[in-house]
């Protein structure tokens, strides 16, 4: 990668971010900066804290659909009418096979299930799958299992896994995307997980009609919570979801590539020493501008997502190499 020479204004932002002296007004003002300046600042911070590496992760939709929650963006919600495959929890053999299929590319593998939480029987089976993956691959294991209780979190801590629980958006905007559970339900799980000693991955989705203020408030909450890995998605509206209808009617404007890249940069500047991980929707929103996201992020989800297909893994590896990054 080329060496970055920051102009005086960009250098001031870089130094304030690195020393954690940026306030909320500073972050709001970032939106008005030129994208190239934001990318330069982000890349300088990335080099300072996380070097020229991209951490790769993959997920498996281990239980799909018929979710009782009413998240307007999710094709797995029974409140939406998307046509997707639905199935109960996959066997440990199927989960292990999926993990092994991405082992040569990914550093992390996450078991993801639909629903507000898991049953006791499902949890026992997931623990068995975690053990299988840890014993038979070199992958680090993550799980996304909804709103877990203290005993479940303690059991997962004993298995040395990372927990994923997305806040999705700001506290103020959350009621616009889901009403069957609230923001504080998620906060409680994250706080309990951190208290127990678990690594935590959390983040949100850009493009659901939220404001720039909402995105910044999300970043500040993630910072306050001490989340280890920040998972950021770009909305790929799926036919049959409530949000697809709202975008199609013009009620919500879809996020564009410039807005997405600026948001990723502001996440980096707000959380300079955290892993910023770009996940679903990047192919749909960024298209041929995906490569520029690598200047702001240091984690990338590869392979397929929960109910949509991802970019060819070889294309991702080529993109990373051509941009001069390691994995």
UniProtKB/Swiss-Prot annotation:
Q: What would be an example GO MF term here?
A: 4 iron, 4 sulfur cluster binding
Q: Name one GO biological process term.
A: biotin biosynthetic process
What the entry lists under SUPFAM superfamilies is as follows:
Radical SAM enzymes
Where is [2Fe-2S] cluster bound in this sequence?
110, 142, 201, 277
Q: Which PROSITE patterns match?
A: RADICAL_SAM
Pathway(s) it belongs to:
Cofactor biosynthesis; biotin biosynthesis; biotin from 7,8-diaminononanoate: step 2/2
Identify the cofactor(s).
[4Fe-4S] cluster; [2Fe-2S] cluster
Name the Enzyme Commission number(s) assigned to this protein. 2.8.1.6
Q: How is the cofactor bound?
A: Binds 1 [4Fe-4S] cluster. The cluster is coordinated with 3 cysteines and an exchangeable S-adenosyl-L-methionine.
Q: Which InterPro entries match?
A: Aldolase_TIM, BATS_dom, Biotin_synth/BioAB, Biotin_synthase, Elp3/MiaA/NifB-like_rSAM, rSAM
Q: Which UniProt keywords apply?
A: 2Fe-2S, 4Fe-4S, Biotin biosynthesis, Iron, Iron-sulfur, Metal-binding, S-adenosyl-L-methionine, Transferase
User: Which sites bind [4Fe-4S] cluster?
Assistant: 67, 71, 74
- Looking at the UniProt entry, the stretches that span the membrane are none
What catalytic activity is recorded?
(4R,5S)-dethiobiotin + (sulfur carrier)-SH + 2 reduced [2Fe-2S]-[ferredoxin] + 2 S-adenosyl-L-methionine = (sulfur carrier)-H + biotin + 2 5'-deoxyadenosine + 2 L-methionine + 2 oxidized [2Fe-2S]-[ferredoxin]
Identify the residues that the record assigns to the Radical SAM core domain, covering every copy: 49-282
S-adenosyl-L-methionine: is it a keyword of this entry?
Answer: yes
The UniProt subunit note reads as follows: Homodimer.
Q: What is this protein's function?
A: Catalyzes the conversion of dethiobiotin (DTB) to biotin by the insertion of a sulfur atom into dethiobiotin via a radical-based mechanism.
Official protein name in the record: Biotin synthase
Q: What is the lineage of its organism?
A: Archaea, Methanobacteriati, Methanobacteriota, Methanomada group, Methanococci
